[in-house]
Regions:
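Substrate-recognition element of Asp-dependent hydrolases with the DxDx(T/V) motif
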Residues: 30, 98-124
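Conserved H-loop
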Residues: 40, 130-134, 162, 206-209
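Metal-dependent phosphoesterase signature
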Residues: 60-100, 105, 165
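Helix-loop "lid/cap" segments that line or gate small-molecule binding pockets
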Residues: 33-34, 54-67, 123-126, 155-157
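A short, structured active-site edge motif that brings together acidic residues
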Residues: 130-145
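Conserved Lys-Pro-Asp/Glu-containing loop-to-beta segment of HAD-superfamily phosphomonoesterases
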Residues: 10, 148-177
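Active-site neighborhood of HAD-like aspartate-dependent phosphohydrolases
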Residues: 2-49, 63
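Acidic, Mg2+-coordinating phosphoryl-transfer loop and its flanking beta/alpha structural elements
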Residues: 169-209
Length: 220
């Protein structure tokens, strides 16, 4: 566990792989979308790389889809996700207590996710976690705000978070680390999600937490 020598006031948290384990819902939604194009995937674990990055990018990167085809795949993905995949999900053990503890330490909490904001709000409301957050920020359905860099900047701008030294991003994938760096803030990479230490360190993680308990201990 890395030790933190700063007192952050504002915590930005990723959703998938950081607050909730959303693997089943996301991979089943991707499986459904790929099936529309005649691609039969039976091993859901093989679709884990789709968790975290913008989905259109992943359809292009992993299956060679054109922009137009990736857009169509995204529509099919949302068709399944909006009715079923949204709730094929669970909160990481200890996360509820961690969020409560951070509020007790007079920190403010924000969500910064590549997931469409409308879905992020539904998920957090479903699990009764929305009350912990000052603001829940995500991507737009029309793709005008999709990169993690843009989402982090959006959350910071909307909430007037202009003291970069007081803000930290917490996430499990390289996009969280890169997005934080592009916005001039520190990042904590978590290993209980979908990325590994090499991915997070090489992407610029300021600190690494192996578990929710480590995260709690680091943010005293």
């Amino acid at each position: 566990m890395d030790m933190i020598d700063k007192q952050y006031k504002y915590l930005l948290l990723d959703l998938d792989g950081t607050i909730t384990d959303s693997m089943e819902g996301i991979t089943r939604s991707v499986q459904y979308a790929l099936g529309h194009f005649g691609i039969d995937v039976t091993d859901l674990n093989s679709l884990r790389p789709f968790i975290g990055p913008p989905l259109k990018d992943s359809f292009r990167d992993y299956y060679g889809f054109t922009d137009e085809k990736a857009e169509a795949a995204l529509s099919k993905y949302r068709e399944y996700f909006a009715t079923k995949g949204l709730f094929e999900n669970r909160v990481y053990e200890g996360m509820d207590a961690f969020l409560a503890s951070q509020l007790n330490k007079e920190r403010k909490l924000y969500v910064a996710t590549s997931k469409p904001e409308v879905f992020a709000r539904q998920i957090l409301e479903h699990f009764k976690l929305d009350g912990y957050f000052t603001y829940i920020g995500g991507s737009t359905l029309d793709g005008s705000r999709s990169s993690k860099t843009d989402v982090i900047r959006y959350v910071m701008d909307v909430n007037g978070l202009d003291d970069n030294q007081a803000v930290v991003m917490i996430g499990d994938r390289k996009h969280d680390m890169v997005g934080a760096g592009n916005n001039g803030i520190d990042a904590i990479g978590v290993l209980y999600g979908y990325g590994d230490e090499e991915e997070l360190r090489s992407a610029g993680a300021s600190y690494i937490a192996a578990s929710v308990e480590d995260l709690e201990a680091m943010l005293t």
